[in-house]
């Protein structure tokens, strides 16, 4: 049996399940980032040279995106040693993580990708075990 990873991810946290001959292990990674709400005074200026101005909200958004990129990097590094990866979760985070795998030419290791609602760590573990138990072995082979 190879190392199989399944993970539920959103912008706040990733719950990662590792399945291997040694057993099952889990890891939770928190992003520690919150999307900052736009404040009423942050709207772009309508002045003559407004195209040269950088609104405060754009600067915050860039910081937010950099922080998320670091989070996706940490999640990728936690799972990149796996032979197969199953990614699921709500929203855009799973797609952003998929891009991390593609950027590093590891996308062939992704054997499952699907939407999922908020789940407890126990539900994540159960879903990952069920995925690998019921997915045909031929689909789990990566260049063997």
Give residue ranges: language-model regions:
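Terminal alpha-helical anchor/extension segments at protein ends
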Residues: 1-144
């Amino acid at each position: 049996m190879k190392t199989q990873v399944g993970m539920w991810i959103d912008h706040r946290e990733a719950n990662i399940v590792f399945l291997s001959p040694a057993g099952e292990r889990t890891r939770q990674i928190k992003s520690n980032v919150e999307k900052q709400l736009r404040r009423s005074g942050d709207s772009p200026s309508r002045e003559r040279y407004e195209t040269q101005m950088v609104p405060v909200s754009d600067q915050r958004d860039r910081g937010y995106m950099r922080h998320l990129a670091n989070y996706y990097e940490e999640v990728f590094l936690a799972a990149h040693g796996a032979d197969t990866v199953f990614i699921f979760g709500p929203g855009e985070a799973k797609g952003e993580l998929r891009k991390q795998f593609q950027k590093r030419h590891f996308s062939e290791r992704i054997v499952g990708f699907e939407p999922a609602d908020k789940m407890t760590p126990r539900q994540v573990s159960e879903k990952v075990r069920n995925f690998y138990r019921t997915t045909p072995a031929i689909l789990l082979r990566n260049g063997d």
